[in-house]
From Swiss-Prot:
Record text on subunit structure and interactions: Interacts with igf1 and igf2.
Natural source organism: Xenopus laevis
Cellular component, GO annotation: extracellular region; extracellular space
Main location group: secreted
Domain IGFBP N-terminal residues, every copy: 23-106
Protein purpose: IGF-binding proteins prolong the half-life of the IGFs and have been shown to either inhibit or stimulate the growth promoting effects of the IGFs on cell culture. They alter the interaction of IGFs with their cell surface receptors.
Keywords linked to the UniProt accession: Developmental protein, Disulfide bond, Growth factor binding, Growth regulation, Secreted, Signal
UniProt subcellular location: Secreted
Protein name: Insulin-like growth factor-binding protein 2
MF GO annotations: insulin-like growth factor I binding; insulin-like growth factor II binding
Length: 281
């Protein structure tokens, strides 16, 4: 999965807030029905520590230990650990999204005495569970924190300012840029909606964000064959198959909470993409 720079900026604002009080979104409480649907009371193998499932999952899973891989969609690192991208990673946020981080000991000096802030919320406080996943996108600079009241808006405004600066200094290059694809245009619209969200005190349940249809574009701007909603309330998001050019659902393909095996319903992707590229201005 390839994410645009714009989406990574917003993911950073949501997932990598510098302090617990700055997190924008909180998971809703787990209902008795959701908890009862968990497969057994605990994972089969003994765990050093149990944590809540990734995202807003309700079922207990084994925490990742020091040195194990981690990311946005993996189980959280155990207490006292953080999920760090590999040193020198060019796209640290994307590495975390792809699960290419590594659990390591917290560097408290980088976070302004995290013990004073409270490193983790107990797992039984599910009513107020934070979607933190112990992620760190890169080395933090003391005092270089986003404003508390609008981290999301700050990230969006910063990206807009960068776009304006690039457009002013590279007008000749802008004229040569190819037209944005349909997938990229839809992604821009979703980001605009996110930047305009008004939640009480800039907080709210994750459904406000997860309910948005965020398109999954590849590195060339086409739709990825498989599109999925994010997991929420302990359930995996639904996945379906689309045409990479138009984004429309492929006829006969299923919508499932798993792998819809899109390759069975789309057999000539390269030919169609080449034809579309030749027709594009």
């Amino acid at each position: 999965m390839v994410l645009s720079e714009h989406l990574l900026v917003l993911l950073g604002a949501v997932l990598c807030a510098p302090a617990l009080s700055d997190v924008l979104f909180r998971c809703p409480p787990c209902s008795p029905e959701r908890l009862a649907a968990c497969p057994g009371n605990s994972p089969r193998s003994p765990c050093a520590e149990l944590v809540r499932a990734p995202g807003c999952g309700c079922c207990p899973v084994c925490a990742r230990l020091e040195g194990e891989s981690c990311g946005v969609y993996t189980a959280r690192c155990a207490g006292g650990l953080r999920c760090y991208p590999h040193p020198g990673s060019e796209l640290p946020l994307q590495a975390l999204v792809l699960g290419l981080g590594t659990c390591g000991k917290r560097r408290d000096a980088e976070y302004g005495s995290s013990q004073e802030r409270g490193t983790e919320l107990p797992e039984d406080q599910s009513d107020n569970m934070l979607v933190d996943n112990n992620l760190v996108a890169g080395p933090a600079v003391p005092g270089d924190f986003m404003p508390r009241k609008s981290s999301k808006a700050h990230a969006v405004n910063r990206e807009r300012a960068n776009e304006q600066h690039r457009s002013k200094t590279n007008k000749s290059e802008d004229k040569k840029r190819p037209a944005r694809s349909l997938c990229q245009l839809q992604l821009d619209q979703v980001l605009e909606r996110i930047s305009g969200m008004h939640l009480p005190d800039d907080r709210g349940p994750l459904e406000h964000l997860y309910a948005l249809p965020i398109p999954n574009c590849d590195k060339n701007g086409f739709f990825n064959l498989k599109q999925c909603k994010m997991s929420v309330n302990g359930q995996r998001g639904e996945c379906w198959c689309v045409n990479p050019i138009t984004g429309k659902v492929l006829p006969g393909s299923p919508t499932v909470r798993g792998d819809p095996e899109c390759h069975l319903f789309y057999t000539n992707p390269e030919e169609e993409r080449r034809a579309h590229t030749q027709r594009a201005p």
